Amino acid sequence: SSKSEKENIMQNTCLILLSYMECVTPDMAQDLAETADYIIAADGGQNRAREFGLQPDCVIGDFDSTTLDEDFDCIYITYPAEKDLTDTEAALTHALEKSCRNVILLGGMGGRLDHTMGNIGLLDKYYSSFDHMEFIDGKNRMELLKDSGRSLKRDARYKYFGLVSLNAEASGIDIRGAKYELTGASLERASTLGVSNEFKEDTVEICVQDGILLIVRSADR
């Protein structure tokens, strides 16, 4: 195969290191890095890279919250501090330019609530840009599901999973393989019906016919 084909295959999965991470251990970060073909450190994420002994392929940001040391052997991309997009979105834009298909964002939950809510918005904005996109840390994982189905494989780190509608109402919701199963159900945005579910089987099947669901997996702590 050609060099360009190899590069495309190589950059299939992207790991984005964010500055704020909850309960992320070096082992967890290194395991995710091993499955990634391209690693982006978003601004303060370069400090996490140093902390975990990871080598990013690119460091991107406005460097308002961290100094630009340029001590990694990689590409550095600087944005003006008064830019219209966050460092997280700048990293996602770069992942798109690199033709990455799967994106794991390490961190970005907890901490400042406005940032967490903004990151849920990014899951929505970039939903069709990538084959898969998910925020992960030591406490939670979050991803979106729109008008389609998904299989969740049991992950021992996260005992619970919950569904939250991002529409006024999501309908045609099926859940199989879980402690609490649903068939053709509707979920309103204000409803707590979808929270605190658990795996019964090794795989849970979730389907929504009409609407957007935020899928959150949470650790038991």
Language model segments and positions:
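Short phosphate-binding loop-to-helix
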Residues: 76-98
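N-terminal beta-strand-loop-alpha-helix module at the start
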Residues: 10-70
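Short, Lys/Arg-enriched N-terminal segments with co-localized hydrophobic residues
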Residues: 1-9
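Long, charged alpha-helical interface segments
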Residues: 140, 145-221
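Short, acidic/small-residue loops that bind anionic groups at enzyme active sites
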Residues: 127-141
